[in-house]
Amino acid sequence: MEAAADSPAETRSRVEKDSRRVEKDSRRPKKDSPAKTQSPAQDTSIMLRNNADTGKVLALPEHKKKRKGYLPAESVKILRRWMYKHRFRAYPSEAEKRMLSKKTNLSLSQISNWFINARRRILPDMLQRRGNDRIVGHKTGKDANATHLQSTDASVPAKSGPRGSDNVQSLPLRSSPKGQMSGEKIPEPGSAPSQKLTMIAQPKKKVKVSNITSSSSPEPVSTEEYADFSSFQLLVDAAVQRAAELELEKKQESNP
């Protein structure tokens, strides 16, 4: 009955009020969910973080695989030192393995495996680098001694050779035939026998010296030296003949 009693003007006013309320509600900002209100940049950063986390998770097993089988550097140094000291017998006994395991904090199986690999890879380089192989060193020592002896044997004639050549070269300077050939006077008949003996004795001594030098030195004596000795012998013979002639002349004069 009340609705029927309402005038059309009142109904119109109510409708207008309802329409205004609807417009106001439409003009007000709507409260969206937090996922919808985020910007695209924030969305990309979240995606990158998620990918990085997954990459780290995937990379952990590979990192563990790479480090698997590697021993600590300090323990490897200790094992290398022991191998270098015992490089000619790189087979540790059980007691030595226990001692090394205490020093390196490694198990006996790890130490034995390391030595098996090191004997194939590290030990040959140690021996070649240092040259400490006993057989090779023994041979090289013998070769060095042989070469040393050869060098000393070769140095003996080399040292004695120049001395012999000096003696041979000094002989003509001390000898007198060149002076006689250059124009010196023949000795007087009174002193001829004594000079004759000295002159005959001198070539013998000189010949002996020349023989010694020729045997000690490898260089042969030249033929010019023999020519000088032959001319000297001729001069000696001439002097002897002249002295004999002078003695005969004196005897003839003393016994007319």
From Swiss-Prot:
BP-aspect Gene Ontology terms: regulation of DNA-templated transcription
Location within or outside the cell: Nucleus
Regions of compositional bias (Polar residues) in chain numbering: 35-45, 166-179
DNA-binding region: 62-125
Ranges for region Disordered: 1-45, 136-224
Keyword Transcription regulation among UniProt keywords: yes
Biased amino acid composition, Basic and acidic residues: 9-34
CDD domains: homeodomain
Sorted UniProt keywords: DNA-binding, Homeobox, Nucleus, Transcription, Transcription regulation
PANTHER family associated with the record: HOMEOBOX PROTEIN TRANSCRIPTION FACTORS (PTHR11850)
Function: May have a transcription role in testis.
Protein name: Homeobox protein TGIF2LX
UniProt organism field: Papio hamadryas (Hamadryas baboon)
Gene coding for it: TGIF2LX
